[in-house]
């Protein structure tokens, strides 16, 4: 169990307000434990975790390192952010590779001395932010750590008092040749990568591969800025469990599109600042020397200068004079031009670096001082700029001739000095311009940094949400893993119990064989005793014959025999009493004992057998019903999966049909493209976003169970953007409404799929509950079987006791026979002695034969009585033999019963093996069905991938067709527009011609009207004249 399933051996209880390790039920098969940010004050209850490799107890209240002696497999130990004052209790951690004791109050490192040598494997040691004072103690405790590669006593400006000692780094690197890096820097001073130093930080996070780094947002930020931005990755932050992170992120911006590390930038800035300061000092020295030189000849002129000449020139005047005289200064001062070029290069390099707030203050102060110096220099220059006319007016007429000669010499000198001053002032102006540009760049950079920090905070919030979701998903997976592990433990426990029962059966069989061997040995001893008894009877007959022959030998021998007979009579009486008492006891026992062949015992056995058979048949029937139910449920699940696949295929077809409908609608609306080009562009962007949404949703359907909340957040953001675009599109076109309807359909499909997934999860939970019920029923059956086993074991013990009693009776009988044999031996010895005595007394007996003949009759009668007694004893022996035969018959009956019990046990063992085979078959069938389902799921995923690829290809082809159609349509529109313009022009010309014709016609009609009116007037006049004449 310990090595089969390593995924079920992780425990994460971060920030659960745990105050003691004894509150947690820790499985002995755990691989890693994370108890970060709790209230644990003592390390205890970890002795049984022999497989533990990663232990995180950071951010707790631990004051002493203890209770870790039994963790032989521990590889990484994190005790940072606790209340430790010394290192101890690490002697038996032979496999420890990484030890983090940072952010404590450690002063004593002597606990690292037992880790010296090649037996321990400590390679990473973190001791930053502690109270270590002496280098000697550090060297003493770390010299013998032969595997130590990375030692950190200072990190992120949080170190120990030792780090401030002179030559601290050189001393430690000289005395510890095994070190590769000290405080995150290798022996050459280069920073060590996080992969080399923190290669073991990802011990218990299994689900970080499902977290998405937000690169798209960063790309937008990079495009908005002048250069790329580097931020700390989310995965590296998660590996450090979000503790003791640096508040400042490494953000490097470049104006030319290239970025460098912060370390190089800081060095370069220091070098450039030093060069600038040296250059400014040289310029100040040159200006001071020139001022000192110019002070002597100018002291006379300053008295005679007018106030209007001593006014300070403005920046615009100085700049104009600089521009007018730039050519002369460049010719005279090539060195200054070189310095200006170098200063430009330095300014460009300065723009590549990152400036801090303190540097900005220094630059501002320097600029103020330079501006003051510049104004002083300009005042001096303006004071030196005097015209010949003004000087002539001030000096007056009497000194005009002598002063003119002096002025010429002074003007020559002043021109040289002014040229040098102007060059220096130009350099200062250039420096000022560069500083001003740098300030503007710094302001832009600070604004960009603020924006990036706000974005980083938002990303941190999103990452925290992602971590929370991963924690919840991990907890759910751990619960499922624990449930699976519990079921496996139950199965393993049942197997162990079955093995124990099999072992007990084997032991019982061995005991049976031992009993059979003992029974055979008893039979052999009984046969030997019977042969010995037969031999003894033959010897007794011989002795009786010898006694009959020798009775007439001597009366003394008869007296002795009488005494012996009396003694034997007493012994026989005692034996008779003992035998009668034992016979009575044995009869009582037989009366109280139930006969194995009796009807009552057989009736009880038959009832119990019938009950057990009925119960066994019921169990088999219940198991078959459960199997049928499980098969039906599995078939129902398969049908549901198939129905879900069919529904998904139908929905995919519906989406495709909707997509085709949209394409047809777009083809229908091509006629109105010339009126709403901008609207079509917006709709095209919306279509692209919707197609990307569809692709993302289809690609993430398989990953919904792992990253559901992330997908929902993305969907919400995209839905908000789509809603904004849709609000604009509602006012402009009807097409956006159709797209919104399709979007709502897609959302409803997603909700339906989520409901299906929830239903599948509920069915999975029901399935787990049914499995638990089956486990409970199996446990109940196991309890019943254990009760039956206990009853049968009690019966076996009673039978054993009966066997022991029978064996005791047999032992008693054998002891009686042994006593009889001892008496016979004693008689034999006495007879031998008597034979010797008889031999001695034969002579005496011959003399007394005559006297004893009369007494011989009486003695013969006594001998007859003795013979009768011997016959009775023989009859008693025969009765004892019959009893032995009966006991043998009883033993045979016991053997038969024992064989029947063995058969029953074998039948039960066969039943158990049959049940085991059925359980294995069920498990194999279940595993096969699971594999089939997994294969079907993989096939469906592959089909989905193929379909998505086809959709993408179709989408690309459709886009190409759309682009080609749009281009053709645009060309046609252009042609139509040109044709229509031509037609409009022709129509306008025709209209103009028609208007002219109409105007001409109107003029002609007007003329004709006038002519007609004149004719009518003439006619009326003529008619009136005719009437007058008549």
Swiss-Prot record:
Pfam families: LRR_4. One of its GO terms (biological process) is cell division. PROSITE patterns: LRR (PS51450). The keyword Cell division applies. Its main location: cytoplasm. Residues 300-311 have a biased composition (Basic and acidic residues). Residues 298-401 are annotated as: Disordered. Belongs to the LRRCC1 family. This is Leucine-rich repeat and coiled-coil domain-containing protein 1. The lineage of its organism: Eukaryota, Metazoa, Chordata, Craniata, Vertebrata. The gene is lrrcc1.
């Amino acid at each position: 169990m310990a090595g089969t399933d390593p995924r079920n051996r992780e425990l994460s209880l971060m920030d659960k307000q745990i105050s003691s390790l004894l509150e947690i039920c820790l499985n002995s098969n755990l691989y890693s434990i994370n108890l970060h940010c709790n209230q644990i004050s003592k390390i205890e209850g970890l002795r049984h975790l022999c497989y533990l490799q990663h232990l995180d107890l950071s951010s707790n209240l631990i004051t002493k390192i203890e209770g870790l002696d039994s963790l032989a497999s521990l590889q990484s130990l994190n005790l940072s952010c606790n209340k430790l004052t010394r290192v101890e209790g690490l002697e038996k951690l032979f496999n420890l590779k990484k030890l983090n004791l940072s952010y404590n109050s450690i002063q004593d490192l002597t606990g690292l001395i037992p880790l010296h040598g090649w037996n321990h494997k400590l390679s990473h040691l973190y001791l930053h932010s502690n109270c270590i004072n002496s280098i000697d103690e550090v060297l003493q405790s770390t010299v013998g750590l032969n595997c130590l590669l990375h030692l950190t006593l200072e990190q992120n400006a949080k170190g120990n008092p030792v780090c401030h000692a002179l030559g601290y780094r050189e001393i430690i690197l000289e005395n510890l040749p095994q070190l590769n890096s000290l405080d995150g820097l290798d022996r050459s001073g280069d920073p060590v990568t996080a992969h080399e130093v923190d290669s073991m930080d990802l011990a218990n996070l299994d689900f970080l591969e499902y977290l998405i780094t937000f690169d798209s947002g960063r790309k937008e930020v990079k495009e908005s800025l002048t250069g790329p931005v580097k931020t700390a990755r989310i995965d590296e932050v998660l590996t450090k469990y979000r503790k003791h992170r640096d508040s400042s992120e490494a953000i490097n911006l470049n104006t030319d599109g290239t970025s460098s590390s912060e370390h190089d930038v800081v060095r370069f800035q220091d070098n450039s600042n030093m060069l600038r300061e040296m250059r400014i000092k040289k310029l100040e020295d040159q200006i001071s020397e020139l001022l000192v030189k110019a002070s002597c000849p100018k002291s006379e002129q300053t008295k005679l200068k007018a106030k209007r000449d001593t006014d300070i020139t403005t920046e615009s005047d100085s700049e104009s004079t600089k521009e007018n005289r730039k050519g002369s200064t460049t010719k005279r001062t090539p060195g200054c031009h070189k310095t200006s070029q170098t200063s430009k290069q330095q300014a460009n390099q300065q723009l590549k670096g990152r400036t801090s707030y303190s540097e900005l203050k220094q630059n501002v102060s320097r600029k103020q001082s330079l501006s003051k110096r510049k104004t002083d220099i300009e005042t001096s220059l303006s004071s030196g700029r005097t015209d010949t006319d003004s000087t002539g007016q001030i000096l007056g007429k009497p000194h005009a001739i002598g002063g003119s000669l002096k002025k010429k010499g002074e003007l020559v000198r002043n021109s040289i000095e002014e040229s040098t001053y102007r060059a220096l002032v130009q350099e200062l102006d250039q420096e000022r311009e560069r500083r001003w540009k740098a300030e503007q760049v710094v302001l832009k950079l600070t604004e960009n940094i603020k924006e990036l920090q706000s974005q980083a905070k938002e990303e941190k919030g999103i990452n925290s949400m992602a971590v929370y979701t991963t924690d919840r998903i991990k907890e759910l997976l751990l619960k499922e893993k624990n449930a699976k592990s519990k079921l496996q433990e139950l199965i393993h426990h049942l197997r162990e119990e079955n093995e124990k029962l099999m072992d007990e059966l084997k032991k019982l069989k061995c005991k049976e064989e031992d009993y059979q061997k003992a029974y055979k040995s008893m039979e052999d001893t009984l046969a030997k005793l019977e042969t010995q008894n037969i031999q003894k009877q033959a010897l007794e007959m011989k002795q009786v014959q010898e006694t009959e022959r020798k009775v007439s030998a001597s009366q003394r021998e008869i007296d002795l025999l009488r005494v012996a007979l009396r003694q034997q009579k007493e012994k026989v009486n005692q034996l008779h009493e003992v035998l009668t008492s034992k016979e009575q006891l044995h009869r009582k026992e037989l009366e109280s004992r139930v006969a194995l062949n009796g009807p009552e015992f057989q009736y009880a056995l038959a009832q119990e057998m019938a009950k057990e058979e009925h119960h066994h048949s019921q169990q088999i029937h219940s198991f078959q019903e459960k199997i049928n139910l499980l098969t039906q449920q599995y078939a129902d699940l398969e049908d549901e999966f198939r129905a879900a696949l069919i529904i998904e295929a139908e929905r995919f077809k519906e989406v495709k049909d909707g997509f085709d409908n949209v394409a047809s609608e777009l083809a229908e609306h091509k006629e109105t493209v010339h009126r709403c080009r901008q609207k079509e562009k917006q709709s095209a962007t919306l279509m692209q976003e919707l197609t990307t949404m569809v692709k993302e949703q289809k690609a993430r359907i398989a990953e919904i169970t792992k990253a559901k909340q992330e997908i929902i957040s993305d969907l919400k953001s995209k839905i908000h953007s789509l809603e904004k675009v849709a609000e604009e599109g509602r006012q402009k076109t009807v097409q956006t409404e159709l797209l919104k309807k399709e979007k709502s359909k897609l959302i409803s499909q997603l909700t339906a799929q989520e409901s299906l997934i929830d239903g599948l999860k509920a069915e999975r939970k029901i399935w787990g509950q049914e499995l638990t019920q089956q486990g409970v029923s199996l446990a109940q059956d196991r309890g019943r079987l254990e009760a039956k086993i206990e009853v049968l074991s009690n019966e076996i013990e009673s039978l054993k006791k009966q066997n022991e009693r029978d064996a005791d009776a047999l032992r008693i009988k054998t002891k009686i026979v042994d006593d009889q044999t001892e008496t016979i031996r004693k008689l034999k010895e006495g007879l031998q002695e008597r034979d010797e005595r008889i031999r001695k007394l034969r002579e005496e007996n011959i003399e007394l034969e005559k006297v004893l003949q009369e007494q011989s009759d009486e003695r013969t009668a006594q001998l007859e009585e003795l013979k009768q007694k011997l016959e009775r004893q023989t009859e008693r022996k025969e009765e004892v033999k019959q009893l032995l035969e009966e006991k043998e018959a009883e033993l045979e009956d016991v053997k038969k019963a024992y064989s029947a019990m063995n058969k029953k046990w074998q039948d039960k063992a066969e039943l158990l093996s049959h049940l085991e085979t059925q359980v294995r078959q069920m498990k194999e069938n279940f595993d096969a069905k699971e594999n089939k389902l997994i294969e079907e799921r993989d096939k469906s995923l592959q089909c989905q991938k193929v379909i998505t690829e086809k959709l993408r290809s179709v989408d690309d082809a459709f886009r190409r067709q759309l682009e080609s159609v749009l281009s053709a349509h645009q060309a046609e529109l252009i042609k139509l527009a040109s044709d229509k313009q031509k037609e409009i022009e022709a129509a306008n010309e025709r209209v103009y011609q028609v208007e002219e014709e109409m105007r001409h016609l109107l003029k002609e009609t007007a003329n004709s009207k006038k002519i007609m009116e004149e004719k009518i007037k003439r006619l009326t006049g003529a008619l009136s004249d005719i009437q007058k004449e008549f």
